[in-house]
A protein has these predicted regions:
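Cysteine-cluster motifs in flexible loop/terminal segments that predominantly coordinate metals
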Residues: 1-55
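Active-site pocket-lining/capping segments in soluble small-molecule metabolic enzymes
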Residues: 65-66, 79-81, 162, 172-202, ...
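Acidic (Asp/Glu)-rich catalytic clusters
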Residues: 66-67, 91-96, 115-125, 146-154, ...
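Active-site-adjacent beta->alpha loops and helix N-cap segments on the catalytic face
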Residues: 84-85, 107-121, 137-145, 163-187, ...
């Protein structure tokens, strides 16, 4: 399979396989005060157009005896950037309550490279998932990082285009966007890496999202990580449409974890993420918001894990404004309760 490199004119992220997950509710672009160019299209670009600069794609050959599988519980690892000691102590705290830890690639802070993060997490006794975004790396840098990850063989790589950097965050730094998430997934798969990809089911243009996830599967992804959907009916509708379009790979559904105003606001500020108003009120007005937040997350996780096609859940969010330790303890408790409900022993 050859992956098209023919960009859609007018996209500031120079995407071929858009739209990104940051399209606003009114159809406007995340980065410019103009309509998203993909929101005005009737369909997606053709995936199999070749050319001299095309990226080879396709599902990698599984090595004999390969034990890779999607995690049932994937927990966000949120720690201060560049702090290896805190990262590893937090990873150790969380390792027994989940199957893998996901570390982000953020637009507003400089952290270790993903390959270094993967080694630090693995050395702490946890299974790493690392996010690799196209925002801050040109194609050569992306290839270098993927080769380092492939050499170590430690991590699943979540390939994303990346959210645009805010106007007041490092205005002296350029944004690359040489590739988008689909083309990056093809490149990663061609190097034999286990590839995860993201999709936002509720972002405009909603009708194009299921097929876009299938394109990423065809590029070589093994699992889709979905942004939060405020209700199982909406998620089921998306998954039905995706399967009708050819989706075969499993998905990981997002569970929002918040226990106070700040952690709720941090989630709400993420592009394409929506928290049901009743869920927010239930947690924030409770006598014990921490327990209410934990219980709500456990209930959502168990509900999602019972859905057809959902292989796992991602415990996503800041969790608590009281610091890294408090947040990790909340995440760990959620993971333990979900495992207990599924009959998994510590």
């Amino acid at each position: 399979m050859q992956i098209s490199q023919e960009r859609v004119s007018g996209c500031p992220k120079r995407m071929v396989f858009g739209p990104c997950g940051g399209v606003h509710d009114d159809g406007s672009c995340e980065m410019l005060p103009t309509p998203c160019v993909f929101d005005q299209l009737d369909g997606l670009p053709v995936a199999t157009v070749g050319g001299p600069d095309a990226v080879a794609g396709g599902r990698p050959v599984e090595p004999p005896g390969s034990a890779w599988r999607p995690p049932t519980i994937l927990t966000d690892l949120s720690v201060p950037p560049g702090d290896a000691a805190t990262l590893q102590s937090t990873a150790r705290l969380l390792a027994g309550s989940c199957d893998a830890l996901l570390v982000g690639d953020h637009q507003d802070r400089v952290d270790f490279p993903p390959s270094t993060l993967a080694r630090l997490i693995a050395d702490a006794g946890a299974v790493p998932w690392v996010t690799l975004a196209c925002r801050d790396r040109n194609r050569i840098s992306l290839e270098q990082e993927l080769r380092a990850l492939a050499l170590d063989g430690l991590a699943t790589v979540l390939c994303v285009t990346g959210d645009g950097r805010a106007y007041d965050v490092r205005p002296d730094v350029t944004q690359a966007f040489d590739l988008d998430g689909t083309r990056l997934a093809a490149l990663a798969a061609s190097l034999g890496l286990p590839v995860a990809v993201a999709e936002t089911p509720t972002a405009r243009p909603v009708a194009l999202r299921p097929r876009r996830l299938v394109y990423k599967q065809e590029a070589g992804a093994r699992v889709g990580a979905l942004n939060h959907v405020p209700g199982t009916a909406l998620l089921a509708e998306f998954l039905d449409a995706a399967r009708a379009a050819g989706l075969r790979m499993p998905v990981i559904a997002s569970v929002v974890v918040f226990t106070d105003q700040r952690s709720a606001d941090a989630l709400a500020a993420l592009p394409g993420l929506e928290i049901a108003a009743e869920r927010r009120e239930l947690v924030l007005t409770a006598d014990d918001p921490v327990e209410a937040g934990i219980a709500a997350a456990v209930d959502e996780a168990n509900l999602l894990l019972g859905m057809h096609g959902v292989a796992g859940v991602n415990l996503s969010g800041l969790a608590s404004a009281d610091g890294v330790q408090a947040a990790a303890e909340i995440q760990a408790e959620i993971g333990r309760r979900v495992r207990e409900a599924r009959g998994v022993r510590p």
